[in-house]
Amino acid sequence: CPVAAQGRHGDGSWCKYKQMIPLNLPSFNIKTKVQGGRTLVFDFLRRRYVTLTPEEWVRQHFVHFLVEHKGYPAALLGNEVGLKVGGVSRRCDSVLYHRDGGRPRAIVEYKAPSVPITQQVFTQIASYNSVLRADYLFVTNGINHYCCHIDYEAGNVEYLREIPAYPELK
């Protein structure tokens, strides 16, 4: 259960969802509930409960990490952002926008902890970025995190050792 440390949900019910594995991210007080036999988690960016899946577990932890530990403004982040890639509707897992004009500054692709980060995952986020043209790409499965900075003028992609703090973004 994602709230195994407490053993119970905030409403006092026991978690019926399969065990979520610990992530390579800071823990936080995650808000969950059971409704209609499904475990839901509160997404504070979307301001609603969503189905708790392994990928959603990673998303909630990573967004919390960005906001609480790296100083990213929650008001500039969006989850499940729609876009069209080659005429096909897709959803980018998370987007960080620029303060001025709302242009995407970074995009994030999440995978479940059991899903390895492969070239296919980087190809997926690159296809989204062909439309969004963000300066940073983050890929994580909650265990391994990858970040690259794209310099469009120089035509360079720089892989970074760690996720930069918000004030460090170029």
Regions found by a protein language model. Give the residues of each.
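Acidic, Ala/Val/Gly-enriched low-complexity intrinsically disordered segments
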Residues: 3-5, 11
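Hydrophobic alpha-helical context, especially transmembrane and signal-peptide helices
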Residues: 1-3, 38
